[in-house]
A protein has these predicted regions:
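C-terminal motif of bacterial Sec signal peptides marking the signal peptidase cleavage site
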Residues: 2-5
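Zn2+-dependent metallopeptidase catalytic domains
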Residues: 8-225
Length: 225
């Protein structure tokens, strides 16, 4: 889901000037990213190098936030499409759809996470403080989406008669377990508390990682003959 999936993404509504999702539509903060911001962004292009290696030489710090915003909008559209599907929940239209949702977000975060963990700078540190809490809010919204979880539960309740092979059965088990462990079955009041804890942990984890990296970079050992 999202940060660990890959696949074709649903198109999000666009205007010539910008792509956006409003808070009233999603219950989440509004996100707007312009076509101009995305122009020439390597994360919006197909990577043709062997093994899909990212074009690191073409990526600069200014590419991360626009690409992240666009990918989040695509993730929201993917989730909305699953929830709004008028057909009865099935393994394909619910479990597989969740598994491949938000693949473009994974593309950005794989690079961003590795770079910020190994070769960060002040600009990237500021981006971390914005991007990770933003993603935590998105994941909270997905994990606590009751309509989405009801579809997952429906498929899971039918697992013994779906005729799934070992791999698909494992995927169904993992998706259902992930929702449960992230609090999908909790009461609304407890979900609110968990969401707040998740956001606090996101900020603290980012801060700890940044301090650890700075400490590692500052370390030195003197060797004398």
């Amino acid at each position: 889901l999202a940060v660990s999936a890959c696949g074709e993404k649903a198109e999000t509504p666009e205007t010539p000037a910008a792509t956006e999702a409003t808070a009233s539509e999603t219950g989440l903060p509004e996100i707007v990213v312009s076509d101009e911001e995305l122009a020439g962004n390597p994360f919006r292009q197909e990577w043709t190098a062997d093994y899909g290696v990212p074009p690191f030489a073409e990526i600069d710090d200014g590419h991360y936030m626009p690409a992240t915003k666009k990918a989040i909008l695509e993730l929201r559209a993917d989730i909305d499409a699953i929830v709004d599907n008028p057909d009865a929940p099935t393994f394909e239209n619910t479990i597989v759809a969740i598994d491949v949702a938000g693949g473009s977000l994974n593309k950005v975060l794989n690079v961003f996470g590795n770079i910020t963990n190994t070769d960060t700078n002040d600009t990237l540190s500021e981006l971390e403080a914005e991007i990770w809490p933003m993603l935590t809010r998105e994941m909270n919204a997905i994990n606590f989406n009751q309509d989405l979880f009801e579809r997952v539960k429906t498929v899971y309740s039918q697992r013994d008669r779906l005729g799934l092979d070992e791999q698909d059965a494992r995927l169904l088990e993992l998706v259902h377990r992930e929702f449960v462990r992230n609090g999908a079955d909790l009461s609304p009041e407890v979900k609110t508390k968990v969401a707040a804890i998740n956001e606090e942990l996101s900020g603290l984890t980012t801060k700890f990682g940044r301090n650890l990296l700075l400490s590692t970079k500052a370390f030195k050992i003197e060797v004398t003959d």
